[in-house]
Amino acid sequence: MARKCVITGRKTKAGNNRSHAMNSTKRTWGANLQKVRILVDGKPKRVYVSARALKSGKVERV
C-alpha cells in the first residue's frame, strides 16, 4: 500500500534543501497521513488518510 491518502490523493513531495550559501540537496516532505479504518465499498478497511481529510469530516472512522 503506497503512502498516499485515498481520499485527497496527498502524498510525499520532493524539493530542495537550501543552505545560506544557496547550495541545494534533495529532500522530501511527507504528508501527515494516518492509518485508519474506514468503510470502503461497504466493508471496513485499514487505509492511509490525511489529517486534513479527517479534520474536515470528508471521511468517517469505523
Swiss-Prot record:
Region annotation (Disordered) ranges: 1-24
Pfam families per UniProt: Ribosomal_L28
Matches recorded under SUPFAM superfamilies: L28p-like
Classification via InterPro entries: Bacterial_rp_bL28 (IPR050096), Ribosomal_bL28 (IPR026569), Ribosomal_bL28/bL31-like_sf (IPR034704), Ribosomal_bL28_bact-type (IPR001383), Ribosomal_bL28_sf (IPR037147)
Biased composition, class Polar residues, residue ranges: 14-24
GO process terms (BP): translation
UniProt keyword list: Ribonucleoprotein, Ribosomal protein
Keyword field contains Ribonucleoprotein: yes
Recorded GO CC terms: ribonucleoprotein complex; ribosome
Coiled coil (residue ranges): none
Alphabetized GO MF terms: structural constituent of ribosome
Ribonucleoprotein keyword on record: yes
Source domain of life: Bacteria
PANTHER family according to UniProt: 50S RIBOSOMAL PROTEIN L28, LARGE RIBOSOMAL SUBUNIT PROTEIN BL28A
Family, similarity comment: Belongs to the bacterial ribosomal protein bL28 family.
Protein name as annotated: Large ribosomal subunit protein bL28
Organism: Bacillus pumilus (strain SAFR-032)
Originating gene: rpmB
